[in-house]
């Protein structure tokens, strides 16, 4: 009986979603012309390594016609209140989110949390610990640069925002500002990538810890850009399977780094493990100038239908409900 009700709910959801997520924009010889509502569930601001403020990000996403966007800064929720305030009079939905780094088989992987309670005390305590580990790494890198004569300061790394979570992208911008490199990309290739002289690893938490923290905060955990970890398809599936066992709910199938074939394979992987397919541009602004909100790179388009699937999955699993 319960399975039958679930199937009916799923059918109704799919039917209504398909009706609601196409908007009539005109009529041509008696035929309606439609466009698809679009979303972007992976966006960064100056709260971490993006170049636009949360307000600027929201306004840009709205001007581009998005139905919804998620602010997912690295290891911080400090930009969410500003983003929500900027969107209070807009029809576009702003989703509180985050992108948390963790370690898997000596590789750094990222897990997104969508619809998190960004004021949850346990989450804030968890992020404070992660911030300290990142801070220690940053000071070690800064000391190494200064020892070798690079005139880079903490103020340079803040990029005008003392509350920002400093990443390697901030080091790249500081190197560019002082003329040590001609581009952000060159800074990474010459100094900041893992095989370069000024790279320093940091103590990372486990995926299980991240998933537990996101779930406790009512969030919907998603594995970000799964192909960037270069595990191969078998290794990627092994990672997805392990994360699923510990509470993973979604898989970022659509990303600026994927081609259409890769996105299709990831959708099949998501289906195999009963994960919601998600997608986002991974917009950073000036740090990745070829990636735009909502359209990313390589013809990226993420339908709002996928957000409906996420919301249904959350409802069925009781996520976010007290």
Describe the predicted segments one by one.
Residues 86-237, 241, 298-321:
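Extended substrate/RNA-proximal surfaces in nucleic-acid metabolism proteins
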Residues 2, 21-24, 28, 292-297:
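Intrinsically disordered, low-complexity segments enriched in small/polar residues
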Residues 274-280, 285-303, 307-313:
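C-terminal active-site subregion of NodB/CE4 polysaccharide deacetylases
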Residues 6, 22-107, 191-194, 205-288:
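An N-terminally biased module of ancient metal coordination in phosphate/nucleic-acid-related enzymes
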Residues 1-10:
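Extreme N-terminal basic, low-complexity initiation segments
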